[in-house]
Design a protein with these regions (language model features):
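Non-catalytic alpha/beta scaffold blocks inside enzyme catalytic domains
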Residues: 1-161
Length: 161
């Protein structure tokens, strides 16, 4: 993954660099409590979606043990310790080789990338959009949305009055 890029996006969106919790509907920053390692080690996560990262090979044992006990979805370009423990694993195209985008160097310099050649596998964005669409369909099927449509319909189903 591109840790610096992920940190830059979180900082841009919230003002905090990492360790951000959105469970109350707004960002809260506490790196001793809300980092991925803390959340998993404390047993606070009820599911995990892991993208282009392999915590199964380098997180503390307590965090990995919790991952083994919750639903885990992984998107990665290769087989890893984390894809092996996942309930669902998607093999994806490699960004910067098969897909375009932007990565950030460790000194925060952005580098635009163009695809060098095609992949038989979908990119992360395609998979994430398909997952979002299916989750919305399941939410709407389960809940009455009171006549709303689109995103409002999903919001009404998820947050009933």
């Amino acid at each position: 993954g591109n840790v610096t890029g992920a940190d830059n996006v979180v900082s841009w969106q919230t003002g905090y660099p990492f360790g951000v919790n959105f469970s109350r509907g707004y960002p809260r920053f506490n790196p001793g409590e809300f980092t991925t390692v803390d959340t998993l080690s404390n047993g606070d996560a009820d599911a995990a979606m892991i993208i282009a990262s392999d915590p199964g090979s380098n997180f503390p044992k307590k965090a990995i043990e919790h991952l083994k006990n919750i639903p885990v979805v992984v998107l990665d370009t290769k087989s890893t310790d984390t894809t092996k423990l996942a309930h669902v694993a998607f093999k994806t195209a490699t960004y910067g080789i098969n897909t375009g985008g932007t990565v950030y160097r460790m000194d925060d310099v952005s580098i635009p990338l163009r695809p060098a050649f095609e992949s038989p596998f979908p990119d992360d964005e395609t998979i994430l959009k398909a997952i979002k669409k299916r989750v919305h369909e399941l939410i709407l099927k389960k809940n009455d949305s009171r006549g709303a449509s689109g995103e409002a319909k999903v919001a009404a189903a998820v947050n009933p009055l």
